[in-house]
């Protein structure tokens, strides 16, 4: 195994978690998405940021912090001015840290265009891919993305109108909220929505099969925008650093515990990368719903994927989290090392409902079902002297019926969402059979 921790970080070279594919450049890793051996790309080494960066982090803006982090990841491959522009364009919105209760803060990741944390990765990746395509003079790159809800809207809106790129969003029929669906089925232009007769796992399988199909790849230039793509998940590290900066400003930076509602594991992986770069986080908590594959792994040391089950925290309904391979790789496959830095929790729909209801009643803070898992895990697991931050990954209005049903009150819908709701849905039906999907793509 090649060590992930080296004195120099240069993502110019990425290797695959399966260790069978040749080492790739950043550009190849971003354009291809998945390695030839079906593994996920990992940076060759991770460079800690200097101590003076952490000493002065509370004086820097979100964009300044993000640029320093992006430079450590991508700086050797992208000219400084271009990278700065990509970062500043991506972060056109704030990610405030809001106090909910004693020693527990919400990192609100829902102030972007589609009101979900994936706006950060989606916008960054769209701009980075756009840059590489222009640089190569390429035409017509096709982005395939499977979504259980928020990824589709964030990626579609991130890429909307980006020249030379067409996005195909695959989503499970009837398993995505109307608000989520409207955010990627009403856009038109270079975005096509495919309504798959199956589950999210079926959608993800179609995307992965397409990448592995030789004939398709000879016919079309394909890439992925799921968190399997390094350009999607690495930028998510930005807001962990910014959360720390805000804690520091509040005089609460010691013994920080970060809790991440976890589905496909891209989000927590980005946080773990931050820790490897020296970010002073004491420990992480991965909060699962009933799809508690990771929680079971922590308990038993065995990774046993299983079909996902539907819950009210639908973005976390993942039965075989892709990024688990990255977590394993980051810790050299050691269950003991993983357990030392990450603990897990698992909650039922009933417990999630209870948490949303009580937090609204006691603190007048409205959680979405995913954030509720994060908040509850901190309520249950924070130790004396620790400060907890949970990631509030999407605006509660994106889960309108669920949230209104729980609190028994109307939830105000942000103007951005109201705009989407006015649009007309346009999608193409698709079977979960790869042969049909392939036929469709070959006809493009």
Predicted regions and their residues:
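A glycine- and small-aliphatic-rich helix-loop capping segment at beta-alpha/alpha-beta transitions
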Residues: 123-134, 158-168, 185-187, 275-281, ...
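Active-site/ligand-binding loops adjacent to catalytic centers
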Residues: 180-228, 232, 285-373, 406-444
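Well-ordered mid-protein domain cores that form the structural environment of catalytic cofactors
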Residues: 106-161
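Single conserved hydrophobic/aromatic residue that forms the stacking wall/gate
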Residues: 1-11
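Domain-scale recognition of functional cores that engage charged ligands
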Residues: 205, 209, 218-275, 279
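Small-residue-rich anion-binding loops in enzyme active sites
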Residues: 39-115, 187-217
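Short glycine/serine/threonine-rich phosphate/pyrophosphate-binding segments
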Residues: 119, 125, 144-157, 177-178, ...
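Glycine-rich, mobile lid/loop segments that gate access to catalytic sites or pores
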Residues: 142-178, 183-184, 190
